[in-house]
Amino acid sequence: MKWIKKGTFSGKQYRDDVSRKISWGHWFAFFNIIVAIFIGARYAFIIDWPDTLAGKLYFFVSLLGHFSFNVFALYLLVVFPLSFIVKNHRTFRGLTVIFSTICTTLLLFDTAVFNRFNLHLSSVVWNLLVNPENGEMSRDWQIFFAPMPIILLAQMLFSRWSWEKLRSLERQKWLKGTGIFLTTTFIATHLIYAWADAYLYRPITMQRSNFPLSYPMTARSFLEKHGFLDGEEYTQKLAQEGRLDALKIDYPKKELTYAPITHKPNILLVTVSGLRHDAISNEKMPKLAKFATSSTEFTNHYSTGNSNNAGLIGLFYGLNANYTDSILSNHTQSVLIEKLRAENYQLGLFSATNFKDSIFRQALFREIKLSSNKTNKPNNESAVKNLNDFIKAQKTDSPWFAYLDLALEAKNPSDYDRTLQDIDSLLAKALESTPLENTLVIITSEHGLTFNEMNQKERENYFGRDEIQVPLLVYWKDLPVGKQNGLSNHADIFSALMQTVFRVENPLMDYSQGRNLFDLKGDDWVLASNFRWNVVIQPDGTQYHIDRKGNYKKFDKDYIEQSSDRPPLGIFLEAFQLQNFFFEK
């Protein structure tokens, strides 16, 4: 190539040229640091802005430290080597300008992507947005490349001006002090975050993903090793209060209004943690199978996640499970429970596990005094007995809401089948004491149960049908008896109760991500989630997984991973909007 001249890379002239290019590169990098900080300031208007002064100050410190480090790192990785390789200074500056223009444009594009999807740019997100199959969407995003000529012009002008004024610029002494200051902000960013992570200071830890290529330092293992941190207590506190990077939640979006309720049915909601989608049959649960013949059975129903908390978020909040940590950390109340109390429903809450799942005491029933069961060890039998006593004590003219939380634990299929028989008998007793003529009965599961051998991390991210497809029986006089094969999930149950029973007048988007289950139309797709993955499930069981970093996988109905470069554009655009809609901005 002409711009890489042959000959030896030695001699005084060569060293002087390289020295001048390196000196110019420092000033050009400084210029781009300012540009990056200016563009990066836009994230302040996108993120969940912290409430505390320390949180606000950390944003500005991290803004300066993060972008100054990343720009200078790119200079060292790309521009600095070019100083030695490319001998022609015009070609060298031209390549540097082009590279800087591309990076600056991508940063500007990332702010737009983050604003819409709360995701930073990745190969999967890029393929979704710059998609020739959707010309209109492509045109929308191409608008963000319109400033590229302006950015290129600014880079060219500064490149030429700084090269011509280099001798004058080299006499400036303040650049060294500025460099030390920016280096200090970078170090402070990581040290402050490590402190906040260790002491659970959420106004700072919630800013973990503010910027692209952001990987703040943590020091839990170091502090635990040297006795400054109790690892077990720390993990338990996280489980109770939600992950540290959880955002604030805006739920419901608007104040809910209701039409007058002419008839208040009793409501019995039963969840059996670990009940698989194929459990209700004459062979495994004959009594419940008999009850199913007089109920509406939803055969293609999914939980909103793969844990108890995740399923309960869908049932009681109508949201997908990626809001779990936000609900825990903000102690967000369920509008369903609030409405039940406002309508003077008698509440009966019974748990075989003493409400051990954090969502119960941290948020869902936080305003309700729950029994501790200190004298007798709670189990399925005692929970059902307490439920039956509660139902018998109710007056016929006073509506009640009863929630029965049962647990199904088994290590292998044979243990599972034996436990099913016990659960079947207990549910039969509960239904016998229930006045069905005036009661809406819902029986489902927070999530299923898998017998596959997996470690903890694999189990947390497992979304096979045995784990997230669950049975659903609804006994309700206004529903047709029989099997419904349409796709549904737990958020649809919540929406049905709010719309059909309590006659909320707001549109669903104000308070729920589900559809009305009782419309019986079925969903085009449903969403299951955990703190990392969002899983789109289609009626045929096909799953599309995308995580918070833009990684993507596709699975068939048997949970066998398929080769796929890109998920369906329309579905994922809707899914992205759903996963961020109720986060406060």
From Swiss-Prot:
Gene3D superfamilies in the cross-refs: Alkaline Phosphatase, subunit A (3.40.720.10)
InterPro entries recorded: Alkaline_phosphatase_core_sf, Sulfatase_N, YejM-like, YejM_N
Annotated Gene Ontology cellular component terms: plasma membrane
Superkingdom to which the source organism belongs: Bacteria
Residues in the signal sequence: none
Family: To E.coli YejM.
Protein's name in the database: Uncharacterized protein HI_0841
